[in-house]
Amino acid sequence: MFMGEYRHTVDAKGRMIVPAKFREGLGEQFVLTRGLDQCLFGYPMNEWKLIEEKLKALPLTKKDARAFTRFFFSGATECELDKQGRVNIASSLLNYAKLEKECVVIGVSNRIELWSKVIWEQYTEEQEDSFAEIAENMIGFDI
């Protein structure tokens, strides 16, 4: 399981050090793809295969299913960590998430998310005020 928030940088070659606590969970190969809210999602291969099966089961006749599947898979790339624990992020993904120098890597249960520091700070500031309301609206979810 992935959890926590870490600050890192993306170098001029588009490489970022993956937090040590996430490396083992991601494994030797993992998938990075466009996520929601202008971040990137990173999945270990076993989790990616589960998502792949669910998305393949969506009806081809549904416009939203086709659109989401295209969005999700067309942005996906298989990644490996180098000996320094860095991942080379595709330029299309860097552009999508507006990852420049400073970034934030968070753990979200079965995946990691890579955020631009600026976008993450805006997102958390916006969500902070509505966190209690969001939790209240989650039907059947008790902590």
From Swiss-Prot:
Transmembrane segments: none annotated. Residues 5-47, 76-119 form the SpoVT-AbrB domain. It is found in: Cytoplasm, Nucleoid. Keywords: Cytoplasm, DNA-binding, Repeat, Transcription, Transcription regulation. GO terms for molecular function: DNA-binding transcription factor activity; transcription cis-regulatory region binding. Forms oligomers. NCBIfam families: division/cell wall cluster transcriptional repressor MraZ. Belongs to the MraZ family. PANTHER family: TRANSCRIPTIONAL REGULATOR MRAZ. This is Transcriptional regulator MraZ.
